[in-house]
Amino acid sequence: MPRKKPFSVKQKKKQLQDKRERKRGLQDGLRSSSNSRSGSRERREEQTDTSDGESVTHHIRRLNQQPSQGLGPRGYDPNRYRLHFERDSREEVERRKRAAREQVLQPVSAEVLELDIREVYQPGSVLDFPRRPPWSYEMSKEQLMSQEERSFQEYLGKIHGAYSSEKLSYFEHNLETWRQLWRVLEMSDIVLLITDIRHPVVNFPPALYEYVTGELGLALVLVLNKVDLAPPALVVAWKHYFHQHYPQLHVVLFTSFPRDPRTPQDPSSVLKKSRRRGRGWTRALGPEQLLRACEAITVGKVDLSSWREKIARDVAGATWGNGSGEEEEEDDGPAVLVEQQTDSAMEPTGPTRERYKDGVVTIGCVGFPNVGKSSLINGLVGRKVVSVSRTPGHTRYFQTYFLTPSVKLCDCPGLIFPSLLPRQLQVLAGIYPIAQIQEPYTAVGYLASRIPVQALLHLRHPEAEDPSAEHPWCAWDICEAWAEKRGYKTAKAARNDVYRAANSLLRLAVDGRLSLCFHPPGYSEQKGTWESHPETTELVVLQGRVGPAGDEEEEEEEELSSSCEEEGEEDRDADEEGEGDEDTPTSAPGSSLAGRNPYALLGEDEC
């Protein structure tokens, strides 16, 4: 018997790599040269994410994979509704990396921040959303699902046939998630479309507006959420923009954590988070406006007096809690009934449905990921009933919540509609899970060309010997300078971890601590008019009246917006557990009418 030859761990690792590459039909050694963190993440993702029948001719990348040993006790698959996006090609990723290293960033004008919805979605084009095909009660479940799959494939084929991958944005390729939207629209009497006030055009697909108000004949309420993250003048300008272009809309301003914009704050608070205690959800700005909109829509067909009484109880409870100076327990009022919908509830209903059945109005909450749908429901209920997370795609199936005996809320998972938005903007909008981005550097460059990130964070150019000298910046330089400032180092070689730094900067932008707000067309020319508008003054007063009063604690964040400390680490955006606590980023300071200055962030010695 021949003597056994020594076989090192390095040789074994190389053997396994070659075996995997042969299985994928790739050439031996194609990826052995890439040993960076991003390269290892890409190799791992490509081993787990492959193309399947849900794509036409394009590779699909599945995000938010959950560990599962099969179906749960109720037959629920945790990966059924995960995000499905088209995968960026390796050549495209490498091209963007080179551009991030070489392209010098130039600041853009204020007019570039103005977004026109007609350029984003091109109403009337194939950039639509899939509709449920016609069906009848004579069809079996298998026939119906097969018909829906064929229709969905045709829908994807039309879009990819009309636009190249470079022009298209990320959008949902998972049919199961679109089925959730169909069911929610069929169940609803009123549809809430929740958008982020920093970029509401991104979250407002005109095709959905036409379908809901036209074909379904339902009322659509546009909720401009997170209004505490934008100047009041900009909020009012967006409100009038949507009223002008979509007259059938009911526009409501909302935020779960209102803040008085007249209150000065510490500019160094970007590195701190504000922990809200007790009755934080009961101070939401907007439930009263939403109630008035629903009363105007139902015109007395539903008794909403119980909802008005609940709002009054929440306001009184919040006021009493402020005066006591103690942390309060959860509301002892009527419990909120939560119903998780099963597969049988997902089956289509009849072509005609009784409106306001049994005196109950059903309000469907739809929108893009990470716009705050779950937080809005918590704000309406007055306490935490829905798990929330910074990770887009956190809501995996729709649930119903009885706000009062006559008001039922329906929470739908976030959906990304097809558009022509730059993918970097989608990343900054929180649509794509940051921890799973293959190439985050161009998104950082997109941000830095629109707000002065280098000056705000007091970054020193990595090649600068004289701090006072001017040096051209590229996206890679910004990431390297932030890694040096924060002490982000790779594990073995102790080099600046630019991937982690880019991840950190993107989280600052998504959280609103690096605030990038887009404007409606013509806002730059009429900015003074909007700042002196009566509704702007009214909004400032309203925010000051319902803002938090002494129930916040600030704690410094040790590891700010970091992720991927080791290979194989998954997304660490944990749910905000705890019934009465909520961690939110502390806003930056500002003026009374124009809003806080979103760019006053760090002092030189803060980190």
From Swiss-Prot:
Q: Return the Basic residues bias intervals.
A: 1-14
Carries keyword Phosphoprotein?
yes
The cross-references to InterPro entries, in alphabetical order and at most eight, read: G_CP_dom (IPR030378), GNL1-like (IPR043358), GTP-bd (IPR006073), P-loop_NTPase (IPR027417)
Annotated ranges, domain CP-type G:
178-418
Extract the GO molecular function terms from the UniProt entry: GTP binding; GTPase activity
Q: Which residues form a coiled coil?
A: none
Biased-composition ranges, Acidic residues, are 550-584
Which parts of the sequence carry Phosphothreonine?
Answer: 48, 50
- Region (Disordered), start-end ranges: 1-81, 547-607
Matching CDD domains: HSR1_MMR1
As for family, the record states:
Belongs to the TRAFAC class YlqF/YawG GTPase family.
Q: What is this protein called?
A: Guanine nucleotide-binding protein-like 1
Q: What is the scientific name of the source organism? A: Macaca mulatta
